[in-house]
UniProtKB/Swiss-Prot annotation:
Name of the protein in question: NAD(P)H-quinone oxidoreductase subunit L
Protein encoded by which gene: ndhL
Membrane topology annotation: Multi-pass membrane protein
A GO cellular component annotation in the UniProt record: plasma membrane-derived thylakoid membrane
Function: NDH-1 shuttles electrons from an unknown electron donor, via FMN and iron-sulfur (Fe-S) centers, to quinones in the respiratory and/or the photosynthetic chain. The immediate electron acceptor for the enzyme in this species is believed to be plastoquinone. Couples the redox reaction to proton translocation, and thus conserves the redox energy in a proton gradient. Cyanobacterial NDH-1 also plays a role in inorganic carbon-concentration.
């Protein structure tokens, strides 16, 4: 009974929890990272790609429109 729950918890963490945290981290740090940190970010995207693919229909990464004041 405990083994299926463990597998379910690990699958949920791999497919949902960590990718959501990774998306927030990428959004905050994308334009201000060093080259070493960017390499680490690419590694995390490669590692958690299935979870990012699951979340991709629900994520909007387009930049917000600029407000031009006249």
């Amino acid at each position: 009974m405990i083994v299926p729950l463990l597998y379910l918890a690990l699958a949920g963490a791999y497919l949902l929890v960590v990718p959501v945290a990774l998306l927030f981290y990428l959004k905050l740090r994308w334009y201000v990272v060093s080259s070493i940190e960017r390499t680490f970010m690419y590694f995390l995207v490669f590692l958690f790609f299935p979870g990012l693919l699951v979340l991709s229909p629900f994520v909007n990464l387009r930049p917000r429109p600029r407000k031009i004041e006249v």
